[in-house]
Every structure is written in C-alpha cells, then in structure tokens.
Amino acid sequence: MQLLNTLYVTTPESYIHLDNDTLRVEVEKTTRLRVPLHHLGAVVCFGYVSVSLPLMHRLADDGISLVLLDSHGRFKARLEGAVSGNVLLRQAQHGLGRDPAFALAVARNCVAGKVRNCRQVLLRGSREAKVPEEAELLSRGAADLAATLRALPTAADLDTLRGFEGEAARQYFAALTTLLRASARASFRMDGRNRRPPRDRINALLSFVYTLLMNDCRSAVEAAGLDPQIGFLHAVRPGRAALALDLMEEFRAFADRLVLSLINRGQVGANDFVEREGGAVLLEGDARKTVLVAYQERKQENLSHPLLSEPVPFGLLPHVQARLLARTLRGDTAEYLPYLVR
C-alpha cells in the first residue's frame, strides 16, 4: 500500500500552478518546490494562496483533493472531482442512516473506540509517571473511562449515548494536562475542551491537529465511495461532514498524543501563539509548519491492524476503517469494529 501524501502550502502569497505533470509552488515568482502529481493525495492551502485554474482541473481529473483553510487552519472549502463509488452503497448508507437501531449500533462502536483509545493514553501515562500522586490521578481518570465503556451498552438512544461520550470527554481532558512535563503546565493549562474559538494554547493546538485529522478522514470516506454528510453519531447538518467526524472519533487519541509530544519536546512553546480580541488563542508563524511536519511524520509510522497481515502506516488507517464501514453498510459484516490502540 502506498501512503497518499498531503502537500501543505503555508507561505503567504504563494502561487501554485501546473507544470506538465508537476505541481509548482512559487513565491514572488521564484520556484520554491516542484512535486510530481502522482505523489500527491491532497493539497491543503493555508490563507492567501493562489491556485491556477489549469491546476484545479488537473487535480479534479486525477482525484486529488484541494482543501482551502484560512490562515489559522479553519476549514473554508474543498474541491473534489466527480463523485466516485457505488451508488448502491450510498443508497444503503442513506437508508441505514434513518434506521435508529443501526445508527445507534455504529455510533456506539465509534464512541467505544474513542473512549477505549483515550483510556490507553491515560493508562500509559500512569505507568510512566514519576510522581505517585500524578500516577494515581491518571489511574482514576482511566477507571472513569472504563466505567463509561461498561455503560455504553445501556444507551437506548443517540442522545443518551452522546451524553456518555460528553462525560467521558470531560473526565479525559480533566486528566490530560497531567501528561505534560511540569515546566509546561503553567503555559498550557486548560479548563476542559473549548473551541470556536479555542480559549487557551493547548485547545488551539488540539483544534489545529483535529482539523488536519478531519480532512484526512473525509478523504478516506470519499475514497471508499461513501457520502461524508450522512453520519450516525453526529447529527446531519448543512455543511457538516458528519460521517468523517464519526470516523475521526477513534483516532482523536492519536492527535492528542501528538499534541502532548510537541509540547513535551519543546517543539511548540508558549510564544508560538497569539491571543486575538475576544479571547481567541491561535497557533502562529513557524510553529504551524513544525506541527505539519510532525503530523506528516506521524502518518508514516507503521501500526499493526488486527484484520491485516502487514503493518499499516497510520495515514492509511482511516482508509482501512472507511472500507470496513462500507462492508458493514453492504451487509458483508455484522457490525463496524473501530481501530483500537494496543
């Protein structure tokens, strides 16, 4: 399997255009980068980046997605080619999306995957903690998440299930900053998860990485021939890629671990953020490039998958899971099984 690479264009006023079978990046009429199109799975542009019309056509023809984000990483638009995939699969997805029992079963497993993987983050932290009080706090957090896992089968509807998920998230984020090195906690303290806009540095970093992960999950869903708008856990709303968000849940723990690593290694520091009027905190400058490089490197790390005989790069795991979900929608498998961290 080949890992589909994503090109991130972050330099303001860049111009990207088609040069035969190559994408060329220019800044002030100077060529900065050439990338053969067959090496690319997606192109993501931050802020004021110009894209030539011939390149747009070629990306659409070659099935390479073009994603436009604002300068702070918020999603703006996405260009895709013709819709691919089996229409019968999408019909099945739409029909099963209206089946309360089926939707609840898929949503429950998405939440179970998320909670279980987040619990593994806390358990690992507890084992590695040097301070007994911190190890105990992380162990209690892991125990709370284990209680949520035991309660999930009792959820009789999506609202109850979402309530369990919300409480688990609250317990998880309450313990998460304990995994930061002590010298970074004052700068990266958080009072739970907040967004739109993020109100502290760690939430700003989490939001940035979650945006990258969501784009990859949406690409995986679309590559499998599924409709990204029709989800099971996340309610259907205009403009929301509900199914991509469903798929993303089981991978959030990977994003969280990357964020913790960036802070603990000093790759991202307190001065890499700016506070805007109204209290919004945003990742700025070269730190975004640091995060993008680290994210791309993490995507190339090989992980085992219980259903495959060979290691899989993390960047391909959303594609594997999207295809497993498609098999469930076709009726080839009894239930959707999320990817679980070992």
Regions found by a protein language model. Give the residues of each.
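N-terminal ordered "arm"
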Residues: 17-49
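A surface-exposed, charged beta-strand/loop segment in the N-terminal or early-internal portion
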Residues: 39, 47-120
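Long, contiguous hydrophobic alpha-helical segments, chiefly transmembrane helices and signal peptides
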Residues: 43-45, 59, 75, 205, ...
